[in-house]
């Protein structure tokens, strides 16, 4: 979970780079958003999910963090290794999660699609659209995943987003205080 000082650091950097809005999406928790408010911040959370055989991350932007409908997806406590967190908290009901994100006033976006184990990303995205997906993270540091995933590129993901008229988002996928 991000703490107030980390939110402060990230927001300061965002302002220095001239951003008007940013979302800080911690994994499976919105506790930071409940403790910290700023006009530059768009609420968000990154959910660990399984959809079929594919492990993925689903971003929820613009949600009401006080809406109890999303509580069942939130990590109660972050301890142990990241794989323990994934194993314990990853939801397997993505259609219900997307519906609940919408009920909480948000949009559902597939995060860093090059990390998905879907061999046919287009087909996988179409399945997600059929259960309510709103967008896809097109712009993010693909090079972070290059050693493992070589078959999805920014161009491929952008083409899929255009084909299905999805909202295109971008992110840093940072896991520390330095956003750029």
For the regions a language model picked out, list residue spans one by one.
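Extended substrate/RNA-proximal surfaces in nucleic-acid metabolism proteins
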Residues: 30-134
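Short acidic/histidine-rich active-site segments
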Residues: 166-180
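Divalent metal-dependent hydrolysis catalytic cores, especially in the metallo-beta-lactamase
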Residues: 10-31, 106-109
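Charged helix-capping and loop-helix junction motifs
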Residues: 5-8, 120-127, 150-156
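His/Asp/Glu-enriched short active-site or ligand-binding loop at hydrolase and phosphoryl-transfer sites
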Residues: 133-145
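Residue-level marker for buried hydrophobic side chains located in beta-strands
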Residues: 23, 43, 168-170
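Acidic-and-aromatic substrate-binding clefts and catalytic sites of carbohydrate-active enzymes
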Residues: 25-31, 115-120, 144-152
């Amino acid at each position: 979970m991000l703490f107030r000082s980390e939110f402060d650091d990230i927001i300061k950097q965002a302002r220095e780079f001239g951003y008007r809005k940013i979302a800080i999406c911690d994994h499976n928790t919105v506790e930071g958003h409940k403790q910290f408010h700023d006009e530059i911040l768009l609420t968000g959370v990154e959910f660990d999910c399984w959809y079929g055989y594919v492990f993925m991350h689903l971003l929820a932007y613009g949600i009401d963090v006080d809406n109890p409908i999303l509580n069942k997806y939130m990590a109660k406590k972050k301890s142990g290794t990241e794989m323990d967190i994934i194993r314990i908290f990853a939801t397997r009901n993505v259609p219900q999660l997307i519906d609940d994100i919408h009920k909480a006033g948000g949009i559902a976006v597939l995060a860093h699609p090059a990390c998905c184990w879907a061999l046919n990303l287009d087909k996988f995205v179409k399945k997600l659209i059929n259960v309510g997906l709103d967008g896809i993270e097109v712009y993010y540091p693909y090079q972070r995943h290059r050693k493992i995933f070589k078959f999805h590129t920014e161009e491929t993901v952008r083409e899929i987003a255009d084909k299905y008229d999805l909202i295109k988002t971008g992110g840093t996928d940072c896991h520390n205080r330095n956003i750029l």
